[in-house]
């Protein structure tokens, strides 16, 4: 059985394993107050060219989104997101459970359009009853999106301008950020994200780490007592060094970007194979997530040897499935998948 089910099936990159083994019995102070976390933060600041950034390490994506959004928003505020955004669809109501409404907008290939955001905000404040409504207090996007698509630099700049006009933060979910930045023809860099986004996080769980996400507040805008708020959300890891060592390793010698490229290269080969086999793509994703419509009978046969991820039904006899590559995907497994297809 080979797996293309997701990009978090493997453990961690070998260099992370080596570093963790080295420090395993060192006796390191807790809660992220250690030299490894500080070193990782400084390396991330350098990668973002954002020396004033405040950085915090959390364990997982949904936990990070809930903690950040709940800590930044007032009790009467909600967060604008695409109807297909992770916070709106695959986080089990985590944002709503913390008391905030997800204000959904239509998506185009997984992305919210700057014009739609501007129109929503304009209409909200033009409504004479808006004091009786949930205020839009943040714009949430992910890069890559749920469909593996990417924002352009121009789109990020537009969204940033709109958010500044209405004095609300632009928050970018970077669970798969490395894979988005590794695409050859993208015009978005880590520096651009730090420039245009008020808050973003760098995903480790899906990009080479055992677990961990690095939250970056780019404009000295972290909520007061944010560590306390992290703790309040049950998200503060006592062994914080475990995350610090991993991110310190990922941001040494450009390892984060080097291993991200493997996911893009193996995904490109997989797309070639799928095209050769005559499969229809549900959406044109340039990153490591590939969405294909398959006949249910063919899918049933494929799943005897390959794990893939269910996405949605298109009709009674067809299903959209997702193939995901990662930093750890072996090209030989891609070729083997081609035999099963």
What label would you give each PLM region?
Residues 74-76, 268, 275-341:
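Conserved C-terminal alpha-helix-loop-beta "cap" of PLP-dependent enzymes
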């Amino acid at each position: 059985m080979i797996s293309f089910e997701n990009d978090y099936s493997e453990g961690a990159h070998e260099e992370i394993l080596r570093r963790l083994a080295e420090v395993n019995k060192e006796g390191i102070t807790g809660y992220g107050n250690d030299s490894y976390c500080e070193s990782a933060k400084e390396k991330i600041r350098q990668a973002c060219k954002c020396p004033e950034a405040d950085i915090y390490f959390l364990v997982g994506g949904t936990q990070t989104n809930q903690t950040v959004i709940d800590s930044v928003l007032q009790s009467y505020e909600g967060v604008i997101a695409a109807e297909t955004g992770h916070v709106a669809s695959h986080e089990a109501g985590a944002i709503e459970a913390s008391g905030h409404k997800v204000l959904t907008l239509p998506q185009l290939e997984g992305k919210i359009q700057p014009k739609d955001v501007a129109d929503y905000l304009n209409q909200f404040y033009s409504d004479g009853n808006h004091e009786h409504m949930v205020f839009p207090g943040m714009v949430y996007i992910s890069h890559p999106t749920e469909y593996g698509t990417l924002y352009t630099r121009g789109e990020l700049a537009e969204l940033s301008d709109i958010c500044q006009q209405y004095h609300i933060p632009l928050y970018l979910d970077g669970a798969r950020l490395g894979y988005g930045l590794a695409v050859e023809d993208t015009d978005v860099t880590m520096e651009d994200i730090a420039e245009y986004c008020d808050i973003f996080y760098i995903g480790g769980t899906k990009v080479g780490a055992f677990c961990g996400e690095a939250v970056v507040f780019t404009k000295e805008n972290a909520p007061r007592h944010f560590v306390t708020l992290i703790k309040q959300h049950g998200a503060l890891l006592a062994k914080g060094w475990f995350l610090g060592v991993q991110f310190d390793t990922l941001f040494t010698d450009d390892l984060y970007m080097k291993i991200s490229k493997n996911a893009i290269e193996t995904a490109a080969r997989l797309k070639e194979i799928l095209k050769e086999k005559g499969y229809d793509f549900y959406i044109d994703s340039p990153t490591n997530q590939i969405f294909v419509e398959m006949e249910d009978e063919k899918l049933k046969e494929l799943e005897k040897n390959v794990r893939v991820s269910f996405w949605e039904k298109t009709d009674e006899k067809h299903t959209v499935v997702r193939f995901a590559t990662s930093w750890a995907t072996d090209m030989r497994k891609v070729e083997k998948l081609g035999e099963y297809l």
